[in-house]
Amino acid sequence: MTLNPPSPSNASGSVAEDASVLTCAIGDVHGQIGKLELLLDHCERRCAGYATRLLFIGDYVDRGPDSRAVVELLRDLQRSRPGEVVCLRGNHEAVVLAAASDQLHTLPGDVDMELWLGPSGGGLQTLASYGIAHASQLPAEDLEWMASLLLSYDDGLRYFAHAGVHPERSLAEQVEDDLLWIREPFLSHESTFGRLVVHGHTPLKARVPDLRANRLNIDTGAGYGGPIAAAIFDDRQRNPLAFLTNAGEIRMETASHG
């Protein structure tokens, strides 16, 4: 992997001459507040001079050391920059909400309290960051914020959703379970979705973004010790201009092009 400090002279792609807004789409965070703060600094430098939308793909909590700080940072960002910060809900926010209301049995799959609090779920780290023993003790403000998060975002060129979309449904007909949880048949689908689908949810072993003809995965494994990744887009071209992580900019040719 080739990493460089993000700067205009090291741009991986060129912003269209008539572009007016850049979008910085940020992958799964999983309680990694230090990495997130570094990445946001890189995004600010890379997008300097343009109106910028920050779009977070979900999974802010669990596994990492400070879910509470991540939630507070994102909530404060939305308040201080109204209309400029979009936060989507991830399946881990859905799990936290369900755990807080004793509704884990309503979720897809075999999610239960033991799984969520275990090593794969990472819920124990979330509770520890709040200094509490049970999800029902989470601050109402944080639970209300998680419940308010969008499930998807369509900017006309790209469709953003935490996990992806179901290929057998139009983008307008997607349902919550798929937007938050899907892997197959989404990941193996090769035909167009009508937009470039930008998603996370499935950690990439290579720890670099994976750009396909019809989708882009930006979950580079922050929940398992990897970096947090971001993709920079303008409002005139579908594909990303650059990829960043908390460690710096990734040259486009280094990213996976499956």
Show the residue positions of the predicted features.
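His/acidic metal-ligating clusters that form di-metal
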Residues: 136-207
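A short acidic-Thr-Gly-centered motif at the start of a beta-strand
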Residues: 10-19, 45-47, 78-80, 151-154, ...
